[in-house]
Amino acid sequence: MTTRRDPFAPRPRGARPAARSSLTLPPSARRPLTRRSAMLGAAGLMGLGLAACGSSGDGGGAGGGGESGGGTITLGYIPSWTDGLSTAYLMDNRLTAMGYTVEHEPITEAGVLYAGLAQGDVDMFPSAWPEVTHASYMEEYGDSIEDLVAYYEGAVLNLSVPEYVDITSIDELAGQADRFGGRIVGIEPGAGLTEATQDRVIPGYGLEDFELVTSSTTAMITELESAIDAEEDIVVTLWSPFWAMPVYSMKALEDPEGHFGEPEALHHLGREGFAEDFPDAAEWIAQATLSDEQFGSLEDMVVNQFDEGEEAEAVEAWLEENPDVLPPVEGE
């Protein structure tokens, strides 16, 4: 039996590709970041930004390219959001098999990731929520971003409680703040899920007696696990697909007013010029879609079935078990 690990603990590099400097900016940093302005250290950002990535090719982006089946592709993603972590290593495996060099750029905030993608500091965002959750970022940066494919259909945001909590709908939370300690435990302050909860769900359902506590996905999972161990009432912001929903037997509360929005697709996004610079990659990515069952098995393999630092090995194992899910790579 596999022991569940903490997927958010510091991840040793092991055999993973050399990661570039992680960007740790506040959620207010929603403007495009030029390499020059970040490098000069405006507002105390010297040495922290995507400026460190540089440009290594003629394509004008992070990796450049311009030749079929070659070049360097930089993947930008938020490691604690495991849809992005899982698909980043899946893309790494397949793109490497196609002859590309793949680099990883872990980033802590969605707004900064979209800005970096629009600026060309990263080449690809492997698992984005552009239709609803990150619509505001697409409005700001979408003109400089290429939509490569909608790879998964039916993603949703929610408020969730452990299965032992006897409520089934968000509207049942009204008037019960004391029962939950007056708190909804959230994730990163710059997340689209946080914005939707604060701006639409709380006022829409009359939950002003609750405080939305934001920190990180890591902290939310830690607090959730502690509450479940003690069988305490807790309500958290979650989403699906996400490994924690089945692992912790979470119950997504119904959203009768639809304040979280309609189900949306998850997309692979590229910087402007991605398809021109990496035509083989773009053609393959456009055909690479996953069903709910396929995505769930991939994320479970990466997060729960393998140890930290073994994401590449997890993807190899998943591909061995699912050889016909993705389009073939020429020469394999």
Identify what each model region corresponds to.
Residues 1-33, 40-51:
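N-terminal secretory signal peptides
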Residues 69-83, 100-105, 181-185, 285:
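Short, well-ordered beta-strand elements
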